[in-house]
Amino acid sequence: MGKFMKPGKVVMVLAGRYAGRKAVIVKNIDDGTADRPYSHALVAGIDRYPRKVTAPMGKKKIAKRSKIKAFVKVYNYNHLMPTRYSVDIPLDKTVVNKDVFRDPALKSKARREAKVKFEERYKTGKNKWFFQKLRF
């Protein structure tokens, strides 16, 4: 069987606090490591999706409704469901990596980086499916 958990692949989070949220794989570790002896992936995802925007709304209201809250987390493959979609959002690997979980300041910086990149992509109007809440 081929390896399909690759960076850029959109996944659904199945377990935990962010269950039902969409995320994108930043880095995949198929063979596991010493501290995590199972296959896992570093993902960046959307915690709070942008709200619906209509034509009569003003600029300020649209700006407020277009905000996204992001998360960065390491997940076991068992808790991720891959989709057929992939997005090419260029997250800075020096900011978003596995080392951020040791220091809260680095983690918030990584979260901010993901938020900025997600909002940029959302405003261009590409990858619409990724920025819509999963109805279930």
From Swiss-Prot:
GO terms for cellular component: cytoplasmic side of rough endoplasmic reticulum membrane; cytosol; large ribosomal subunit. Belongs to the eukaryotic ribosomal protein eL27 family. InterPro entries: KOW, Ribosomal_eL27, Ribosomal_eL27_CS, Ribosomal_eL27_KOW, Ribosomal_eL27_sf, Translation_prot_SH3-like_sf. One of its GO terms (biological process) is erythrocyte differentiation. It comes from the Eukaryota. The keyword Ribonucleoprotein applies. Residues 5-40 form the KOW domain. SUPFAM superfamilies: Translation proteins SH3-like domain (SSF50104). GO terms for molecular function: structural constituent of ribosome. The keyword Ribonucleoprotein applies. Keywords: Cytoplasm, Endoplasmic reticulum, Ribonucleoprotein, Ribosomal protein. It is found in: Cytoplasm, Cytosol; Cytoplasm; Rough endoplasmic reticulum. This is Large ribosomal subunit protein eL27. Component of the large ribosomal subunit. Signal peptide: none annotated. The gene is rpl27. Component of the large ribosomal subunit. Its main location: cytoplasm.
